[in-house]
Amino acid sequence: MKDSEFHALVEGRYQFIEQAIDNCDTDIDCELNSGVVTLTFVNGSKIIINKQEPLHQIWVATRENGYHFDWKDGKWIDNRGGRELIELLSDACSKQSGEKVTLG
């Protein structure tokens, strides 16, 4: 994959995440700054999402764990657990907010 394709895929996913957070009923602050998305919850916990250009990966840090996502078959898939990015983020947001969150 070329770097330009990677950046376009990541930016598209970041836009989707921002829109999904804005549309959910749970109070989550979503901030994009210098290629890093920070989700901040009322309890002060955070989820950090950033891109790793040299590896062509998206990395996610939650309160419980860290995840590395590769682009496979049209989806961002965790390279250890095999979960899709938005599915994993929905579960992580639910755990950190204490409310059911569905992002996709």
UniProtKB/Swiss-Prot annotation:
InterPro entries: CyaY (IPR047584), Frataxin/CyaY (IPR002908), Frataxin/CyaY_sf (IPR036524), Frataxin_CS (IPR020895). The keyword Coiled coil does not apply. Keywords: Iron, Metal-binding. CDD domains: Frataxin. Pfam families: Frataxin_Cyay (PF01491). GO terms for biological process: iron-sulfur cluster assembly. One of its GO terms (molecular function) is ferrous iron binding. GO terms for cellular component: cytosol. The keyword Metal-binding applies. Involved in iron-sulfur (Fe-S) cluster assembly. May act as a regulator of Fe-S biogenesis. Belongs to the frataxin family. HAMAP family: CyaY. PANTHER family: FRATAXIN, FRATAXIN, MITOCHONDRIAL. This is Iron-sulfur cluster assembly protein CyaY. It comes from Tolumonas auensis (strain DSM 9187 / NBRC 110442 / TA 4).
